[in-house]
Every structure is written in structure tokens, then in C-alpha cells.
Amino acid sequence: MCIRDRVRTYHLQLLDATPFTGGDLKIGDKMTFAPMIQKSDDYEQVESYIAKPYFLQQVMNGKHRWWAFTKVINRNDQAYKEISHIAWNIFIPGAEFDDRLIENEFVQKVLNDKISSSREMRNAQELTLVYQSN
């Protein structure tokens, strides 16, 4: 038996997302969420203008189902205070992402450095859909 000693509640605002592809969710489908800690004032723009195009490319190439970026706008007292945003992903099992968004190695490194310096990513967690109702 599992007994929860605390519940962490976050109210989220959707800031950006790719199109949702692959049809409706079904029992057994998996999604990940990665809590983020904002480290720069332009972090939200970094996700929308650098990360989103990369994930959109993967979606368009049939290698990813969905990516979304949310902001924590409210939380309860038990919730982690440092988490500012959450990134969401639905991967396609067995699909391998393209290595780069940009073919130019220098430009790709600059983009990767900008992403890394703008936020700290906490351990991603996996969710599995276990129930659906009509």
C-alpha cells in the first residue's frame, strides 16, 4: 500500500507547444515531464525560439509526438519553490532524434550553450496513462 505524506500541487500556464500528433492517447502511452529552474531573464524565449524548433523538426519528421513548455503560476506550500517551468514530451518508442537543429557545428554549440546557461533541468519523470473514460 502506498501512503502519500504530501501532495505537491502546481498550477501551470501553457507558454508554447508543437502540434499534438499520432492520434488520441491510449492506455499505456507514456509522457515525460522535466522540471526546470529559470536561470536567465530570456529563458522563456530560449525555449520558444531554440528548443521548440528542434522538437518541431522531430515532430515533422515523425520522430516525436509532442513537446510543450509550461510556466508555474501558482503552487501549494508543499510544492518545490525553485521550479519555475516544466517541459513536457511524448516520445515515439524506438525513434531516434536527429543530432542537431543546425548543421553548422559552431552555431549548434552556441545554441546548446545558451540553452544550458538559461535553465537548470531537474530529473525528468515518466507518466503512464492507466485510465480513460469516454
Per-region residue spans from a language model:
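A mature extracytoplasmic/lumenal domain signature
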Residues: 13, 47, 71, 89-93
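Active-site-flanking beta-strand signature of metal-NTP-handling nucleotidyl enzymes
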Residues: 26-36, 86-88
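Short amphipathic alpha-helices within nucleic acid-binding modules
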Residues: 41-45, 91-104
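A short, structured loop/turn motif at beta-sheet edges
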Residues: 18-19, 38, 59-61, 92-96
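Short amphipathic alpha-helical segments
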Residues: 40-66
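Glycine-rich beta-strand-turn "strand-cap" elements at beta-sheet edges
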Residues: 4-26, 64-83, 102-134
